[in-house]
Amino acid sequence: MLHPRARTMLLLSLPAVAIGIASSLILIVVMKIASALQNLLWQRLPGTLGIAQDSPLWIIGVLTLTGIAVGLVIRFSQGHAGPDPACEPLIGAPVPPSALPGLIVALILGLAGGVSLGPEHPIMTVNIALAVAIGARLLPRVNRMEWTILASAGTIGALFGTPVAAALIFSQTLNGSSEVPLWDRLFAPLMAAAAGALTTGLFFHPHFSLPIAHYGQMEMTDILSGAIVAAIAIAAGMVAVWCLPRLHSMMHQMKNPVLVLGIGGFILGILGVIGGPVSLFKGLDEMQQMVANQAFSTSDYFLLAVIKLAALVVAAASGFRGGRIFPAVFVGVALGLMLHEHVPAVPAAITVSCAILGIVLVVTRDGWLSLFMAAVVVPNTTLLPLLCIVMLPAWLLLAGKPMMMVNRPKQQPPHDNV
């Protein structure tokens, strides 16, 4: 017979698996539709019209129209496409289900149109809202927080293709009764994360790792080099942290989301022309292209890092629906490659992984997630001790510093003013 503790853990196992599978399927459907629309906008349509897909006019035109389209969705859809991600953490309170259709449409348009944001925040919002709404109806005795945790874990597993990230994140957030062991509290979320990861793996495999030269034995000087790289990435990220609320406030003085997002899309188009097609979109496929291109110089990597960081700030400040983690990883990779080109004596594995650690730490203020992203992009077990050590001064630098979020004015409603 099972112990009562085991029976308690099993109570939510079936809902956890169902939520994990559903979270992954929602992500897959959204990404497939966005990919098809992206192919239409950036491959088939310019080819039919006889226009180069990297033409400045095409880049500016598509991104401007994308901004206008997203603005129209936010202006006229019920619920105004959910909350502004610039004002929200990755895992937030559930939104009304009526806001989800507009949010999904706004996300798909942004992903396909080349906006420098990832899918993580809107997908998380959608999955949490659905899990809470459906779960509360089917199992009303289970509180909303449990459904929120399960949906968050399933989404994280689906996004990253592994339950490891969910285990790391929730190990520091599930601060329940001290009488309940941590792994008892992690059981159902890990079931959801595993189900989400396995379901995603049936359709596609998230490809984060880069072909970076293998790092051998750790030296004491490598720790110092890694700490300096992380500090440089943090400094760059804190510039973005300073700019985001100020630009957000300035742009939203116009009140009309169609105008705000149209201008934001136009600015993103100009940045895209300067940075080229590799600086567009969420950044995961593009960072693979960046590493594969042997023609890039130190100045090219620097330009890409600056353009992508600026595009991230503009997209978030304008109110596009998307997450900041994936483009931040691109910025970290560009910074790391730039520093390696500038100082070849420091291995690229160190510069890239420590730059990712620093910039993701600024964006998420989550040590485990930052370590995870650095470790999966540069998969090398020799780096793990170094990354853990480098995390310490990086965390000290950011202690008490502002988050990469906008404080919502008290008079503003839960969703964008329109």
From Swiss-Prot:
<keyword id="KW-1133">Transmembrane helix</keyword>
<dbReference type="InterPro" id="IPR014743">
    <property type="entry name" value="Cl-channel_core"/>
</dbReference>
<keyword id="KW-0472">Membrane</keyword>
<feature type="transmembrane region" description="Helical">
    <location>
        <begin position="300"/>
        <end position="320"/>
    </location>
</feature>
<comment type="similarity">
    <text>Belongs to the chloride channel (TC 2.A.49) family.</text>
</comment>
<dbReference type="GO" id="GO:0005886">
    <property type="term" value="C:plasma membrane"/>
</dbReference>
<feature type="transmembrane region" description="Helical">
    <location>
        <begin position="120"/>
        <end position="140"/>
    </location>
</feature>
<dbReference type="InterPro" id="IPR050368">
    <property type="entry name" value="ClC-type_chloride_channel"/>
</dbReference>
<feature type="transmembrane region" description="Helical">
    <location>
        <begin position="371"/>
        <end position="391"/>
    </location>
</feature>
<feature type="transmembrane region" description="Helical">
    <location>
        <begin position="322"/>
        <end position="342"/>
    </location>
</feature>
<feature type="transmembrane region" description="Helical">
    <location>
        <begin position="99"/>
        <end position="119"/>
    </location>
</feature>
<keyword id="KW-0407">Ion channel</keyword>
<feature type="transmembrane region" description="Helical">
    <location>
        <begin position="54"/>
        <end position="74"/>
    </location>
</feature>
<feature type="transmembrane region" description="Helical">
    <location>
        <begin position="223"/>
        <end position="243"/>
    </location>
</feature>
<feature type="transmembrane region" description="Helical">
    <location>
        <begin position="343"/>
        <end position="363"/>
    </location>
</feature>
<keyword id="KW-0812">Transmembrane</keyword>
<protein>
    <recommendedName>
        <fullName>Putative ion-transport protein YfeO</fullName>
    </recommendedName>
</protein>
<feature type="transmembrane region" description="Helical">
    <location>
        <begin position="186"/>
        <end position="206"/>
    </location>
</feature>
<dbReference type="GO" id="GO:0005216">
    <property type="term" value="F:monoatomic ion channel activity"/>
</dbReference>
<dbReference type="GO" id="GO:0015108">
    <property type="term" value="F:chloride transmembrane transporter activity"/>
</dbReference>
<dbReference type="InterPro" id="IPR022969">
    <property type="entry name" value="Chloride_channel_YfeO"/>
</dbReference>
<keyword id="KW-0406">Ion transport</keyword>
<feature type="transmembrane region" description="Helical">
    <location>
        <begin position="258"/>
        <end position="278"/>
    </location>
</feature>
<feature type="transmembrane region" description="Helical">
    <location>
        <begin position="10"/>
        <end position="30"/>
    </location>
</feature>
<dbReference type="InterPro" id="IPR001807">
    <property type="entry name" value="ClC"/>
</dbReference>
<keyword id="KW-1003">Cell membrane</keyword>
<keyword id="KW-0813">Transport</keyword>
<feature type="transmembrane region" description="Helical">
    <location>
        <begin position="149"/>
        <end position="169"/>
    </location>
</feature>
<dbReference type="Pfam" id="PF00654">
    <property type="entry name" value="Voltage_CLC"/>
</dbReference>
